[in-house]
Amino acid sequence: YCRYATLELIIEEIKENNIEGELAELGVFRGDFSKYMNKEFPEKKLYLFDTFGGFDARDVDVDIKNNFTKGQWFEAVENFKNTDENLVIRKMKYPDNCVVRKGYFPDTIPENEVTYSLVSIDCDLYMPILEGLRYFYPRMNVGGYIMLHDYNTPELKGVKKAVKDYECEIGRRLVKVPISDSCGTLVIGK
């Protein structure tokens, strides 16, 4: 509930302040969070980045090797394979505004330059989160937000590590607000 309530407030802020830029979700899974973003912004494109087939073995290996995530966790969530892009698109109120970017991120980054007003990152693992921050944060318009899921999830230590490593790369701290949802979502403002 808290995550969706926070999303509602962020959407109000973006609308009230006329923040330009598109929408994106990195780590779409079955599209429930994306669906809400799409419904609230009929005039914006929504970029949907996902393998639509579960975690990539390269990212799993990095998390296990660095003790960010235990192998049993991947078994418990069945690698989030229970999805496909057609299932996601059918949930959308404005499906024509959706741009599916199926495959391994960051290989699926759009060729054209896109700026964003709202991005959800919910891919659980260190490398795609770090790559997501590298791509999205510089392209966020002032007044825009990134919602990063699982920031305080004890089983997913790579999420917080990716944020810290990104801050080291750019040489400064991000404007971050943790929210008290069950997985410890982090809101990053620009």
Where are these regions (language model features)?
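Conserved SAM-binding loop and adjacent beta-strand
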Residues: 1-6
